[in-house]
Amino acid sequence: MKTDGGNTWRASHSKPLNTANTMGEPFSHSEYSVHADQSEFYLNELTEHSGQDNPCMNTSRLNTNRYGHPVVHPCPKIHCICTQSNIAAIGSDCTGCVDIAQACKMLRGGQGCTQDPCVKNPHTQCFTDVSNHAMRNVLPLNVSNTEQFPIQIEYANGRNPVLNPMDDLAMRAALLLSKDIDLQNTHILPSTRISIEKNIPVAAGLAGGSADAAAVLLGINSAWQTNYSRCDLLGKAGALGADVPFLIWGGAAYGSGTGSCVTFFETQTLYWVLCFSKHPLSTRKVFQELDRQRSGAGCNHHPVFSNPAECAEMLKKAIKRGPEALAALLHNDLTSAAKMLMPEIAERIKAAERCPGILRAIISGSGPTLALLAEDAEAANRACSILKDTGVICKAVSSPAYSSIYWQT
């Protein structure tokens, strides 16, 4: 493991690189862009030099990957809908490949697409909720056979949030799949460079690092053609952190145990306002404070969430009924600990809930970011404007609707 100026991690591998794939052809250069945020990942293949101008039109994909392993569901639309759309593919792991009309239907919450599908001119309006969704880190992932180090991770904005490479979840995710390839006794490991553009604030309770890890798992799985399904990746993601499995899929979900057991819910579009703090809050310190508080006498868990099975059912029903019902259930056990470490959070929550149309304000993750649930898009934008006038840094976002068919891909 080597570092370059604190902004780039480079990891070598125990086996030599091979510049040819198992079919005896030069290793193709593929460039991927992985968009990661706290609720979704969209993988879009930008270019693939496979003898065809448009990979969407490529109908001659082989039934084995570059490691010689069989591809169970070969599909001409693997990875992308269109190279010009900058919109993520459905079925990027090739377990649920669909045509564009079906992709539109999925991303519009099962409403279907009213226009004729066209590979060369996809209906970008069908993806409005997706393309405009929230904040995301962007991880361009380049694969070639010319780099000295098989795995390189660099931070595009010149700031590496961690000092130790093994504390970097993105690097740990890359090495996790690298180790799997080693165990499969293959001698082919393509050089991979990942440049992370951090747009999600660090130490803000928004799972930005975990989102990066999940995006790396998805991107490398596709780029290296290791052919793990998302269910396979979900199981592996648990080794990286409790919230990484959820981020493999995104959407709305209930996690239990250590986070590896995830139950997904169908949702309608929800509107939120994210309020940021100028100061970070250490997740480790928040949990330490929570442990201290819970070690005291008379400490009880929130009654609504004391029974996992009941909790999942209550959330499912509330989400179906709408934002008002969901707001009544919103709670974060870390709130008291975060308030103890950053007392101004309490006043920020009160100020946020005074905004018309804001149904509930809670801290996101371990804080200090606040997540404000709004009754509709107008209320979210109005609250954002009001809070900005008081000096609060905030952003109105929406979470797309999800139908059950999304998680079948």
Swiss-Prot record:
It catalyses: 4-CDP-2-C-methyl-D-erythritol + ATP = 4-CDP-2-C-methyl-D-erythritol 2-phosphate + ADP + H(+). Its EC number is 2.7.1.148. Residues 1-22 have a biased composition (Polar residues). GO terms for molecular function: 4-(cytidine 5'-diphospho)-2-C-methyl-D-erythritol kinase activity; ATP binding. GO terms for biological process: isopentenyl diphosphate biosynthetic process, methylerythritol 4-phosphate pathway; terpenoid biosynthetic process. ATP binds at residues 201-211. It comes from the Bacteria. Residues 1-26 are annotated as: Disordered. Pathway: Isoprenoid biosynthesis; isopentenyl diphosphate biosynthesis via DXP pathway; isopentenyl diphosphate from 1-deoxy-D-xylulose 5-phosphate: step 3/6. Belongs to the GHMP kinase family. IspE subfamily. Catalyzes the phosphorylation of the position 2 hydroxy group of 4-diphosphocytidyl-2C-methyl-D-erythritol. HAMAP family: IspE (MF_00061). This is 4-diphosphocytidyl-2-C-methyl-D-erythritol kinase. It comes from Tropheryma whipplei (strain TW08/27).
